[in-house]
Every structure is written in structure tokens, then in C-alpha cells.
């Protein structure tokens, strides 16, 4: 049975870029957005293959979460890089809505978008101590591929789009 979200999730557009930057700041646990390793996730947004979704509060229409992906070349890749034709995703939710299903709703809509664009898999990177995110990703078919150094331990995860299903 498909997950029915109480949160409207719509495709992201150029009008959402400032909110995506806010969400990147949240997703990176308040890392400097001027760091090229971080800013690559949104710099030059709107190139071919970029896609985003935005979750809205059902009562007032305020933006409460977002998810997006983009493909990277192997010589300028993100933390969750798996391959040049596998988009890397990022998901973030405003602090007061975490744990309420917003991230799950964004992930499912982003998966639908990736399928419609012909992608076969998605990848991501998440901190090893972000247990809620890891549970969400694993429930949706992502598997752990590798970890990184001990100063900023993280998991690279990947899921084939044929294995990702909506979960309750």
C-alpha cells in the first residue's frame, strides 16, 4: 500500500532556490555554505538533470522540507557519489517538523521524479549518527556501501529505483 502523506509535495522551481539553500544548511548541520564541498550541491542550480521537490504545510502553505538531486562528474563529485549517471540526493526538513513524515513524503516524490526522468538508481551520503535518516533510507531500499574517515563518519548509500517502494 502506498504511503499517503498529509503534506502536499510539489516540484521545486527557480522560486525555491533560497529555500533549498536554507535546507542545505540544515542538511549539513550548519556547515559553511561557502565551502565548495558543500556549495556544489546547489551552485548553478537548474542544469540538466537537476530536480527538486518542496513539502508544504497543509494549513498555511509554508515550505517545511525539500529534497533534491543532481548528477556529478567523477572529477567534481559530492560526498555520496556512486557514478556519473546516478543522481545524489539531499533531504532536509525544518527543525520543528522533523520526525513527522515530511522527509518520507519528499523522498517518495523525488523517487517518482527520478523514475520519470529515466534514472535507475539514487545515492546519498548521511552521517553515521543520523539514525532517523538511516532508518528512513533503509526502509526505502537504500543499502550502505561505504563509510568515511573517523572525523566526520558518514555512510554512502544507494538504492535501485526498482527496489524503492513507498513505506508507511
Whereabouts are the PLM-identified features?
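Active-site rim helix/loop that mediates acceptor-substrate recognition in acyltransferases
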Residues: 29-58
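Short hydrophobic/aromatic beta-strand element in the GNAT-like acyltransferase core
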Residues: 50-54, 66, 90, 123, ...
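A short, internal acetyl-CoA/4′-phosphopantetheine-binding micro-motif in the GNAT/acyltransferase core
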Residues: 56, 88-99, 126-127
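Conserved acyl-donor/pantetheine-binding loop and adjacent beta-alpha core of acyl/acetyltransferases
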Residues: 58-90
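C-terminal "cap" of GNAT-fold acetyltransferases
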Residues: 83-87, 120-123, 127-134, 138-140, ...
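Conserved acetyl-CoA-binding loop-helix of GNAT-fold acetyltransferases
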Residues: 99-116, 135-139
